[in-house]
């Protein structure tokens, strides 16, 4: 396992949660002796939904809602067994999606 690269992708709707999670992952990886590249902010996906305010008339009256998905990328280099074990035991907030590839 020594010398491999782990790529961690994070997704969340709240930018504060994702920043806190990236800080915890980077600190854990550095504490175990791995080299960390990142966090790299990826483009934010913005989905906009437009709906009518009234159920029957007033076509001009509309309301818009948006959903932003924030993404971050972290590359962890020169990993060892301690790094992988520490990352698996890490408790992250519920609103953060983590995708780990080696």
UniProtKB/Swiss-Prot annotation:
Single Gene Ontology MF annotation: tRNA binding
Function as written in the Swiss-Prot or TrEMBL entry: Involved in the binding of tRNA to the ribosomes.
NCBIfam families according to UniProt: PRK00596.1, rpsJ_bact
Presence of keyword Zinc-finger: no
Name of protein: Small ribosomal subunit protein uS10
Pfam family, any one: Ribosomal_S10
Similarity field: Belongs to the universal ribosomal protein uS10 family.
Gene Ontology process terms (BP): translation
Gene3D superfamilies: Ribosomal protein S10 domain (3.30.70.600)
GO CC term (a single one): ribonucleoprotein complex
Record organism: Leptospira biflexa serovar Patoc (strain Patoc 1 / ATCC 23582 / Paris)
Entry keywords, A to Z: Ribonucleoprotein, Ribosomal protein
Subunit description: Part of the 30S ribosomal subunit.
């Amino acid at each position: 396992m020594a010398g491999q690269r782990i790529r961690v992708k994070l997704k969340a709707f709240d930018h504060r949660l994702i920043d806190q999670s990236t800080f915890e992952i980077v600190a854990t990886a550095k504490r175990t002796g791995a080299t960390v590249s990142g966090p790299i902010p990826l483009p934010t996906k913005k989905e906009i939904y437009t709906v009518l305010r009234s159920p029957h008339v007033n076509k001009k009256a509309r309301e818009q809602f948006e959903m932003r998905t924030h993404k971050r990328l972290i590359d962890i280099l020169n990993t060892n067994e301690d790094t992988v074990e520490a990352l698996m035991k890490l408790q992250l907030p519920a609103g953060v999606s983590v995708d780990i590839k080696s």
